[in-house]
């Protein structure tokens, strides 16, 4: 049992060094034969051994040999002999974790409420009001304009037309918002996050479909990646995953669809305020018959300017006013509907018979087909229900829609149908014309307030969508302001806010009526709906593992309906849809150019990364000097040494005493727990204090902490990484250490006047084992070492070394490359990269501006990369 005793002694000795002792259950001794028989037991032990071995050997995190071999290994196993002379190995029984607990910085995580959480009555009522204001504001405005747009091109010819149109509206309202979104799509959320990019992120987390190959194997062990589905037992799900991962065409198609859907969603966010406010203010012509359309447009412009001017201040405190306002609005919708049904008779209830839809198309097929675009407006806001899901549990949203929102909307449409049956010549301002005269002005004011709330809700959803797209590399970086300390999802993007305002005003001033704006509205809504159908279908196949019958039923039913609606809306392209198509195309081009240029830039950086051999040559040739301080080298690549470091050495042949290659990586999850933020590994041998650090953020996280906080977190994480590394090395067998390790190499260590330590004229990647004590100036020593004592001494010295480097200050080395197309590239590539992408890069927010780094601590290296 000599080996066991040695391991125990090592652990005991290391405990005096201030390190956290590894639990004994993580390790066990096995015979070599037993280990060989169990080689096929799974990748867990092998991956763990590889991770420990890589640390023990001082392996490079980014070396080219390790890019595709992270699951191999065996290098972390200690060897010894049992009582019978049997060869034994010390192996891990649990996976080696390469992320480390980091404490001290409190992040205000969005308080998404789980379905299982119990609420008291007061909390429930507060959430009910918040849900109305945040989730259902957009769909609650649809009764203002649905019938107006449906009957804008052809007059009502009889009761059958009204019943047919009303039946279309009722069943569209039931099929799209209720069945598709509330009952199905809401369950496709990404840990509570909704929206088109959340669907894409969910797929990216379960299949490697991203075009930028910056995934890290260890991310699969993050808590957010621990999904129960898909299970490997279902062959269909595995085949779908393999097909998506192996086909470059499918990857590009998925990305193209999500970019198209996002462009349509942003366009929807521009049309919604224009349509909502303009239709609400248009009621003024019913109360004041002499009011002109110019007055309506002017008032709408003023209201929109006020709305976007206070958008930044519309935080959760305003929920106390917005929620009750929407509750009053829905009650008005239901109350007016009941009044009209009691006044004009219950004939509108016949519209629940779907045969009236057939009669409607039979009487005038072309007119009925054209009215489908207007009919879809009753479902506008369905995507906003999903996009604004992050604040509330799914079942709560479902209950609110089924018990309050849907009944009020159905009553409102039934009441308008009853009014139209009795007043078939009134095809304009139907909602306001059906209001009892005694309550007209109060309802008019509440309608305008509800329209403003719906517009604000949609704008907030646009902010969330763009934040997700920026995090996933599909939109230029913008300044993002968090307006609430309690809810992380409440954000404000100044540039986007003013862009939406001017775009919205442009639509209003261009068309000046709800009919032309409504035609564009239908196109935008349908574009988002179709993309949601496609992505939810993929999620059903890949993640939910739904039966093929249910999948086919879902995709055939809803995709067919949406394509029919879409064909009708395309017929009105000349009436107003053309402006939206041009606007959405512009947004799509911006996203495509940014993603395309970013991918080429990343590929160029990967090709230029430095190899170990080149690093060895650079060190001695430049006479590298270790200067006191902490050097943080930022790059986007997750493996290897970035080319910027080589250029830095050529220009200034000196490196700091501690070098950390930092990569800010956005992973396809909403939030990365603070305990899983950093991933560390050594880049070269232990004596030269060079590390790789990947700081991981979700698309909902606040990127990034302040400079001082980030430095503190990084140093704490680095110290814990070194401590854990020393513990794992100490648990290896002493025999293994004696046989495999080279004897320590002497090194000259200098004591600077300020007390800091640094080495002079040392090859960059030479072996270096520091001694336990500070060596006097210009003196050398070769200590006779015991492995356990050496690990303890090296740990203490390295921790002291890091603290001294921290006291000397940190310098940020940032790459600011210029990307250009090669001279022999085709014309359009030169146009995209040299002009459009360069313009976006020069005008977007710099990656490091959010950390508030003092200019005196920043060194920027600008390299020209030809792609």
Swiss-Prot record:
Molecular function per GO: potassium ion transmembrane transporter activity
GO biological process, alphabetically ordered: potassium ion transport
Location of the protein in the cell: Membrane
Comp. bias intervals (Acidic residues): 32-44, 63-84
GO cellular component: membrane
Alphabetical list of InterPro entries matching this protein: K+_transporter, K_trans_C, K_trans_N
Keywords: Glycoprotein, Ion transport, Membrane, Potassium, Potassium transport, Transmembrane, Transmembrane helix, Transport
Transmembrane portions of the chain: 125-145, 168-188, 253-273, 286-306, 318-338, 366-386, 401-421, 434-454, 491-511, 523-543, 546-566, 573-593
Extracellular side: 146-167, 274-285, 339-365, 422-433, 512-522, 567-572
Family: Belongs to the HAK/KUP transporter (TC 2.A.72.3) family.
PANTHER family on file: OSMOTIC STRESS POTASSIUM TRANSPORTER, POTASSIUM TRANSPORTER 15-RELATED
Protein name in the entry: Probable potassium transporter 15
Organism of derivation: Oryza sativa subsp. japonica
Gene from which the chain derives: HAK15
